[in-house]
Amino acid sequence: MCYNKFMNIRTITTANQIHLENETVLVLGYFDGLHLGHQELFKKARQIADEKGLKVALLTFPESPKLAFVRYQPELLLHLQSPEDRFQKLNELGVDELFLIDFTTDFASKTAKEFVDQFVKALRARVLIAGFDYSFGSDKKTASDLSAYFDGQVGVISPVLDQGEKISSTRIRQAVLEGRVKEAARLLGHPLSSRGIVVHGDARGRTIGYPTANLAPIDRTYLPSDGVYVVDVDFKGQTYRGMAS
């Protein structure tokens, strides 16, 4: 599935900043990595939107909602994708309107009813799409509770399995950290990637006939454990096969 229209991206702090002309199929969730399980939600949303003449909207967060609830740990700021890769993938998956809001303590304090009355209505949702494990509101309602607060159609997407096990961002993060990058890519449905700036090193590679490029990461993305990996390097519009360690 590849959707080539331009996606509108807006950063908001309140529901009052949302202004839409068209009714929507609204997708709800955080979606770190946009893995194969996540992609099923957007495929369903795009299908319904095309059938009903609606737009696909997504309300999500730039950072993990866990930051508002648990003791701070540096890894909570890491992602499976850079923001740019995330936005590009969302565009490919058919999202028309992307709304980003920080998951602050004020946002977290809203009840399920307040969330629906303020944000879902402002986003002009006729259909809601969420994953089976979605939760919302300070009163900790689940995806199965959405229909109690929303009069329109609700679609709850079942888990997607790989080798009998649920595909999840947690599973993929663990695979990356343990160096199982082929497994991570399979579960993501797209290659694991990271960006960096070439910096000067000790030039040891030149002494053995293999000049190297030292990369300083510029994104807060998960990197695999120490090892030697086959990589594709995108540089100035060209792709080169390489090795990274």
Go through each PLM region and give its residues.
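N-terminal catalytic cores of NTP/NDP-binding nucleotidyl/phosphoryl-transfer enzymes
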Residues: 17-82
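A conserved beta-strand->alpha-helix junction
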Residues: 60-62, 93, 98-106, 158
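Glycine-rich, highly charged phosphate/nucleotide-binding loops
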Residues: 77-86, 108-115
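A glycine-rich helix N-cap at a beta->alpha junction
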Residues: 80-99
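Phosphate/ribose-recognition catalytic cores of enzymes acting on nucleotide-derived substrates
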Residues: 201-245
